[in-house]
Amino acid sequence: LADIYLYNPRENTKEKYFISELVVKYITLIKHPGLVTPSSVERCMQIAYNAKLNSGCLSRQVGAVITDENYSVKAVGWNSVAEGQVPCNLRTINNYLNNKDEDTFSTFEIENTQFSDHMYKTYDDVINKDVLNGRLCAYCFKDEYKEITGEKNQVHTRSLHAEENAFLQIVKYG
């Protein structure tokens, strides 16, 4: 996780020292934490950055914050599967190969023979030889699907976008 992010929003900066001022600000924060408070935007970005740690997605973790015009936080979201579904970081190869639980895996994953054959071919040796030494191995549906189809498309993710999740929080809780 990055702790420092410098951004120069000015394209035609006449103020020569804008970036220098930001560097001084962060050095001050390092040497004397709490002396300089973060800007409203920095505070919201830090919240979004921390929110992404809740993501159940293996391939991409994203956080989002919705604020009003005064930067008062109204909702926080992160990319994860829809309510009631099991996130990819909790779905394991062992469970897929040995169980194929309908509550955990999609109808496509359970019934599509091409997908099932790919999973057995790719992971059966790993499971049978106990290469993982008892550790669990999660898998990303999108990555496996892209490998089968040869597509580079990101469309086949199971996760809701972080922004979508934040908007759903507003709708659900006000």
What spans do the regions from the language model cover?
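Phosphate/Mg2+-binding loops and adjacent switch elements
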Residues: 1-3
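G-domain G4 guanine-recognition motif of GTPases
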Residues: 5-13
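Zinc-dependent deaminase catalytic domain
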Residues: 13-174
